[in-house]
């Protein structure tokens, strides 16, 4: 399977939780109850029966969401196959271009550096917990370790950004007849995908995100100017290694290669 640009998408909407739950209860009926009963959380994680029941309900809801998504994918595939099978081609002109492009990093400002430095100093005064509630200790220690790591990452990026202002990315572009596929390493915001598709000479252009670069650095978000200005989880300095200018460079380089192999 491949994933198109989806860095600014999530398969849920937070403003109609009650309606969503009612829909799944009507759709899946007794399955929802079975899913709740199947998930037996350890008592050490959730000491009270009420907590365990609440978490089991969350598990059932998440499972229903995934069932629903899977069913919609199957339905969409079956519908498309009805008419797509009318144009099955056994011979195609295939080309594969690979190159490494350089993209502008998102710079850390002096103010952001000072803020993260001070935050790191404060976090170092906080102790990791042991000997208490196992689940609560795990959550606390995981959050603390993550926050310390994030601060250190920002400080390191600030220290090397002048010497290394750009980051390499392996770009693959494939021609298959009248359609094309173009990869990127990011959780890419949809705007960039649309910019590429609108200028591509191909009849249809597929964007494949999270490709060619393994590891945590390969999957960082590539947010737009508007997203960074309005802030948010996927547009924070912790989650963006590349700037919006770098995102546009990705667009330009991808379009250039698409035109070359067309």
Which ranges hold each PLM region?
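Non-catalytic substrate/cofactor recognition surfaces at enzyme active-site rims
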Residues: 1-262
